[in-house]
Amino acid sequence: MANITVIVPVHKLEQNYIVGCIESIKNQKVKPFEVLFVTSDDKELNDYLGKYDFGNLKGVTKIIKNETGNYDFQSQINYGVEQSTGDYFTFVEYDDEVSPIWIKNGVEYIDAYPEVGVFLPIVYETDENGKFISFTNESVWAKEFSEEIGRLDNNTLQKVQNFNFDGMIVNKETFLENGGLKSNMKLTFTYEFLLRMSYKSIPIMVIPKLGYKHTNNREGSLFVEYKSTIDVLESKFWVNKAKKEYFFTED
C-alpha cells in the first residue's frame, strides 16, 4: 500500500478553521502514513497544536517549525515535503477539509495507476459560510475536453488555467526532482506547477470523486491579500510568466 504523508501548512492560529481541518484528517477511512504540521514562529499557534488531541493520529503526527523563516505557501509546502518520509504526499490548507475517502482514494488510484505522478481531486469550492460555489477539475472527465479523458495534458493547460491543485497527491521523488513549488510565482504557482509537470510528460490525473472542500477567497488569507493588490495587467503578467517558467526547475 502506498505511503501518503499529509502536510498542513499553517502560519497563524485561526482556531475556528484549523479544528475542522484536523478533524477531517482524523476521520479518514484509511489512516495517513504521517501528518506534518509545518508552522511559523507563532508561539500561540505552536502551543495550541502541541496541546491538541490528535486521537488516532497521535502516533503519526509531527509539528515542524519551518526553520527557513519563509512562511509563504510554496515555501511551507516545499519544506514539508523535504521533511516527509512517505513515498507520496498531499496537503490540506488549514482552512480547508478533506473528505473521509481521500486517502483511501489516493491509495487505490496509486496502486491502479503507478505511472501517474500527480493526482488531483475534484474540488468542492465554498464561500466562507460553507455555501457551495462550484466544482473544480471535474471538466477533464467531460468528453473531448482533454486529449485523454480523466487526464490533464499540456494542450488543455495552454487553453484553460483555472485548475486547482489543493489536496493533490504527488509522488515525492517526482516533486523534488522537478523543482517543487516556486516561491517567486506569487499568483499563478498552481498553474505553473501543473504546466511544468505536463511539459516534462509527467502524467496528471483527476480522481473522479469528491475529495477536497476549499474555502474560496477567504478574507484574510495570504492569497486573497496579495490578489487584492494587483490589477488585470499584472494578472496577465503572472499567467505569461507561468508559461515561461517551466524551462527552469529552480528559482
Where are these predicted regions, by residue range?
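Catalytic beta-strand/loop signature of glycosyltransferases that borders the donor
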Residues: I122, I204-G211
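Acidic donor-binding loop at a coil-to-helix junction in glycosyltransferase catalytic cores
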Residues: K186-F193
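Conserved donor NDP-sugar-binding/catalytic core segment of glycosyltransferases
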Residues: I101-F135
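Short aromatic/hydrophobic "clamp" motif used to bind/position activated sugar donors
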Residues: F89
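A recurrent flexible, glycine/aromatic-enriched loop bordering the glycosyltransferase active site
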Residues: E148-V170
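Glycine-rich, basic loop-to-helix element that forms the pyrophosphate-binding segment
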Residues: E67-S84
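Catalytic core of nucleotide-sugar-dependent glycosyltransferases
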Residues: L210, H214-N217, F223-E250
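Short, acidic, metal-binding catalytic loop of nucleotide-sugar glycosyltransferases
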Residues: E23-P32
